[in-house]
Amino acid sequence: MSLKILVPIKRVVDYAVKIRVKGDKSGVETANVKMSMNPFDEIAVEEAIRIKEKNLAKEIIAVSMGPKTSQETIRTAIAMGADKGIHVETTAELQPLSVAKLLKELVDKEKPNLIILGKQAIDDDCNQTAQMLAGLLNWPQATFASKVDIKDDSVHVTREIDGGLETLSMKLPAIISCDLRLNEPRYAKLQNIMKSKKAELKVETPESLNVDTNCNLKIISVEEPPKRSGGVKVESVENVVEALKKHALI
């Protein structure tokens, strides 16, 4: 079976950047900050490419939503090995349900039979889009995938659970969300990076997809975690035991 794979990706603050909270606590500073593809989505792109390299897929479509700068993230996916990209251009703050609704409309247009995406984005950690999209499409889903095997018209997904591993089998079409242990994403070759800059991207909008992106959730406050106090050196095991007793920990 030759698959058509849709891979949703998100542009986020780079994982190596030290996050700074805005003065009004409405969010984090993103101006003049290095941005990159969500790490979980990189894994999704890599897995789609590996499936294609096994001659199990004919096309990989990378999709991203957000302002025009999101096109850079799509081009990164193309440089890695995706075949084409779709940009849903919007400046609105998209919540998981809105993202899922937009993806559903794209699925109806593009007709993929496998969707692979990161289990969550590192900026909001919602971990909701895959599940919501599966509900809207009425497709089977396997979340937190650490191994993916495709046989005929079925997908076998191994996922880590408390105390062991769980393997699920699904009929296509299906949705998979990726965990960090699934694979290690490749670096794009320079020649592919240069080619991706000239790649033509298909542009949609929430309006062209007939999706209302009004927010039903409101962020009340974003705060930095409290700073950790320094540790105390102890001279012996007896002193450790005494300190634990003092704080009623034993």
From Swiss-Prot:
Alphabetical list of SMART domains matching this protein: ETF
CDD domains: ETF_beta
Cofactor: FAD; AMP
One GO term of the biological process aspect: fatty acid beta-oxidation using acyl-CoA dehydrogenase
GO cellular component: a single term: mitochondrion
GO molecular function ontology, one term from the record: electron transfer activity
InterPro entries: ET-Flavoprotein_bsu_CS, ETF_a/b_N, ETF_b, ETF_beta_N, Rossmann-like_a/b/a_fold
Key words of the record: Electron transport, FAD, Flavoprotein, Mitochondrion, Transport
Subcellular location(s) of the protein: Mitochondrion matrix
Record bears the keyword Mitochondrion: yes
Cofactor note: Binds 1 FAD per dimer.
Functional note: The electron transfer flavoprotein serves as a specific electron acceptor for several dehydrogenases, including five acyl-CoA dehydrogenases, glutaryl-CoA and sarcosine dehydrogenase. It transfers the electrons to the main mitochondrial respiratory chain via ETF-ubiquinone oxidoreductase (ETF dehydrogenase).
Complexes and interactors: Heterodimer of an alpha and a beta subunit.
Sequence similarity: Belongs to the ETF beta-subunit/FixA family.
PANTHER family named in the record: ELECTRON TRANSFER FLAVOPROTEIN BETA-SUBUNIT (PTHR21294), ELECTRON TRANSFER FLAVOPROTEIN SUBUNIT BETA (PTHR21294:SF8)
Protein name: Electron transfer flavoprotein subunit beta
Organism listed in the record: Dictyostelium discoideum (Social amoeba)
The organism's taxonomic lineage, starting at the top: Eukaryota, Amoebozoa, Evosea, Eumycetozoa, Dictyostelia
